[in-house]
């Protein structure tokens, strides 16, 4: 059989994530595929950079290349966007992801968030309870919704969505771990932090460009929760080039 070397080259600036996953795509077909010159996870790479070289049977490399690139481009896109937000935060506010991930790929996408410098929020519903507007609507008010959660499981940390400052007060009154601010202006977020006085962590759920993260950090909120880092990250352009017979 013909042997060859395949090289993955990135076409745009990125933060690398998922090279081990890409490697496994090739090794699922042939465990003897050899990897050389692999870049580190989390490394910034410039256009034209070689991410890794794969040596093995040409048929193996050609069969797996599409799947390998799909994973690598997707995960690198998430890590790159996350790094943009993390860098913009200057370490003054923690960038969180959400559970809004691709079905069956949550573990990998949350891994890419960590590589990019973000922090995973909840992986599953058993990690904590987020009391949202629908829960409050069904229970009647925030206090009753929280009471029902605690009656079911007193150990789980509780986070409550707050759409108004009155919601913030109600959540603080029942002693939840985190208040998630939803859709309030900067001054209202600042006021929520003031009212909290350390009794609960303040998280801000926002769809803002990364250049506005310093403004959120200035409010004193501990977290910014950004669904876009997994929902809106664009795959990073890469190519897979066969460069000739492997030695």
Task: Give short role names for the model-derived ranges.
Residues 205-206, 224, 241:
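Cytosolic regulatory modules rich in charged/polar residues
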Residues 1-174, 178, 187-195, 201-203, ...:
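Acidic/glycine-rich phosphate/pyrophosphate-binding loops and surrounding catalytic core
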Residues 228-247:
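Short, charged, intrinsically disordered terminal tails
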Residues 210:
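Cys/His-rich Zn2+-binding cysteine-cluster or related metal-binding knuckle/ribbon modules and their
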Residues 183, 206, 228-229:
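Short secondary-structure boundary segments
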């Amino acid at each position: 059989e013909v042997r060859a070397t395949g090289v993955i080259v990135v076409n745009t600036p990125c933060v690398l994530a998922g090279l081990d996953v890409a490697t496994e795509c090739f090794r699922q077909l042939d465990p003897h595929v050899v990897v050389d010159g692999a870049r580190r996870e989390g490394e910034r790479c410039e256009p034209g950079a070689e991410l890794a070289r794969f040596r093995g049977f040409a048929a193996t490399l050609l069969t797996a290349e599409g799947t390998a690139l799909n994973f690598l481009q997707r995960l690198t896109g998430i890590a790159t966007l996350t790094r943009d937000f993390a860098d913009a935060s200057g370490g003054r506010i923690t960038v969180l992801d959400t559970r809004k991930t691709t079905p069956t790929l949550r573990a990998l996408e949350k891994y890419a968030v960590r590589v990019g410098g973000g922090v995973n929020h909840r992986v599953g519903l058993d990690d904590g309870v987020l009391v949202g507007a629908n829960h409050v609507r069904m229970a009647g008010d925030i206090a009753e919704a929280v009471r029902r959660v605690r009656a079911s499981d007193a150990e789980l940390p509780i986070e409550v969505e707050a759409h108004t400052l009155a919601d913030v007060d109600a959540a603080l009154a029942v002693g939840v771990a985190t208040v998630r601010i939803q859709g309030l202006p900067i001054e209202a977020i600042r006021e929520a932090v003031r009212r909290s006085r350390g009794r609960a962590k303040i998280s801000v759920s926002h769809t803002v460009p990364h250049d506005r993260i310093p403004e959120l950090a200035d409010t004193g909120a501990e977290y910014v929760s950004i669904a876009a880092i997994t929902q809106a990250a664009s795959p990073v352009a890469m190519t897979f080039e066969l460069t000739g017979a492997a030695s």
